[in-house]
Amino acid sequence: MAYFMANATRENCQDECRLSPNRDAVEEDLKKIGVECTKVDFDDANVQEDLDQLIKKYNMNYHDEIHICRETMPNFDEKLKIFFEEHLHDDAELRVIKHGAGYFDVRAKDEQWIRIPVRRGDFVFLPPGIYHRFTTDRSEDVVALRLFRNNPKWTAFNRSENGDKQPIREQYLKDVSA
């Protein structure tokens, strides 16, 4: 279950970083910012049908797989640092976790971070223009299916640089305030 989180630093970002006392983020909190989460059962014989339904629902036509771990990813530490930098994209971010565990952090309307723990079978939809970041948990091993509407552009706009100036950010803010 998602929750509002305490400040995370690069040193502790792979920990839960829960507030004390804990404050869960319910489905309505995520819905308000355009985030959707569901489950995909990889042990079900119909898993491909479930994936096809997600692909159709979100009008995706391209996918790939990424394995985030020290053994398979060159410059692992640098990549994790990039993933954890607060950023946004022009396109939606859709991920299905096939193996391992990690955290997607997204900004609530009041600028607090909401942490979404993900593990095998979790599907996450982040709308275009939302500030977010990602990290693995301490296992440092995640395999994710990435779904795209077109071939990936991989353009990230960091908040500290020019993210707020992007037209997609303005559109996102309009969409979530409606």
UniProtKB/Swiss-Prot annotation:
Catalytic activity, EC: 1.13.11.54, 1.13.11.53
Source organism, top-level taxon: Eukaryota
Functional description taken from the UniProt entry: Catalyzes 2 different reactions between oxygen and the acireductone 1,2-dihydroxy-3-keto-5-methylthiopentene (DHK-MTPene) depending upon the metal bound in the active site. Fe-containing acireductone dioxygenase (Fe-ARD) produces formate and 2-keto-4-methylthiobutyrate (KMTB), the alpha-ketoacid precursor of methionine in the methionine recycle pathway. Ni-containing acireductone dioxygenase (Ni-ARD) produces methylthiopropionate, carbon monoxide and formate, and does not lie on the methionine recycle pathway.
Iron found in the keyword field: yes
Location, primary (coarse class): cytoplasm
Subcellular localization, as worded in the UniProt entry: Cytoplasm; Nucleus
Cofactor: how and how many bound: Binds either 1 Fe or Ni cation per monomer. Iron-binding promotes an acireductone dioxygenase reaction producing 2-keto-4-methylthiobutyrate, while nickel-binding promotes an acireductone dioxygenase reaction producing 3-(methylsulfanyl)propanoate.
Keywords carried by this UniProt record: Amino-acid biosynthesis, Cytoplasm, Dioxygenase, Iron, Metal-binding, Methionine biosynthesis, Nickel, Nucleus, Oxidoreductase
Involved pathway(s): Amino-acid biosynthesis; L-methionine biosynthesis via salvage pathway; L-methionine from S-methyl-5-thio-alpha-D-ribose 1-phosphate: step 5/6
Cofactor field: Fe(2+); Ni(2+)
Keyword Nucleus set for record: yes
Positions contributing to Fe(2+) binding: 87, 89, 93, 132
Listed GO CC annotations: cytoplasm; nucleus
Pfam families for this protein: ARD
GO biological process: L-methionine salvage from methylthioadenosine; methionine metabolic process
A molecular function (GO) term: acireductone dioxygenase (Ni2+-requiring) activity
Binding site for Ni(2+): 87, 89, 93, 132
Catalytic activity annotation: 1,2-dihydroxy-5-(methylsulfanyl)pent-1-en-3-one + O2 = 4-methylsulfanyl-2-oxobutanoate + formate + 2 H(+); 1,2-dihydroxy-5-(methylsulfanyl)pent-1-en-3-one + O2 = 3-(methylsulfanyl)propanoate + CO + formate + 2 H(+)
Name of the featured protein: Acireductone dioxygenase 1
